Amino acid sequence: MKMNLKKKIIALAVLPALILGIASIVIALTTVKDSLIDEIQDSLQGTAAAALAAYDQNSGEYMMAENGDVWKGSYNISKSENLVDNIKSKSGMDVTFFYGKTRIMTSAMDDDGNRILASEAGDKIIKTVLEGGEEYFSKAVSLDGNLNYGYYMPVYQKGSTSEIIGMIFVGTDKSRKDAAINKIIWMIIISVILVMVLCVLASVLVSISISRSLREGIGIVQTVAKAVSYTHLRAHET
């Protein structure tokens, strides 16, 4: 009976700490991760908007010359290495300009140090951005075999709200971002576990103390009860 009471008290004290700890870990694995990915998306979107503004500030329409170069007025987008490289150096993100569905300028390099050009966007990107006119965030864009978080933004012809001539893409290395996210999540989980262990230990100690006090109280009551019973018995005998 005494052991059962002790176990019940410990369980009542420890259970809330365990539930709170588990709930905190679940939140860290879901809500916190989603929030961090949302921050990545917002950062990519902001950089894409800045890159698009840098191209759009040039007067004139987007057009392709006979030699295949793409221009915005008098600005040669196909030769805009300095612009995309400068954005990458400041933001840490790769920038790509698509004319139609084809990459014509990018800061992204392959393993040989060459720019990743002339490749085409995937069907889903074409349908969503080029045909649908929607911005698109992806958690897994492959650039020469390397996965990136990526953001696509449609590019409209000058003065038009319906003619889409291409896309701006901004990407950041997925493995590095995931490593940073996982580091934050593990720090939260470890902190929660440490606090949970301390709470459990404190709860056990308090529970043991309460159980001991209850046993002592019960013992005193039983002693008093026996004394009273004995007194009544003696009085009855006399």
Whereabouts are the PLM-identified features?
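Juxtamembrane membrane-water interface segments immediately C-terminal to a transmembrane helix
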Residues: L29-A53
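Short N-terminal helix-loop-first-beta-strand/juxtamembrane motif that initiates sensory/input modules
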Residues: G46, A50, Q57, V84-I104
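Extracytoplasmic/periplasmic sensor domains and loops in membrane signaling proteins
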Residues: S78-G92, S107-L143
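A short beta-strand signature within small-molecule sensing/ligand-binding domains used
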Residues: E135-F137, G145-P154
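Helix-start (N-cap) segments at beta->loop->alpha junctions
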Residues: G145, Y156-G159, F169-I181, I185-W186
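Glycine-rich acetyl-CoA-binding "A-motif" of GNAT/NAT acetyltransferases
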Residues: I164
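Polar/charged heptad-repeat coiled-coil helices used as signal-transmission/dimerization stalks
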Residues: S175, A179-W186, I208-R234
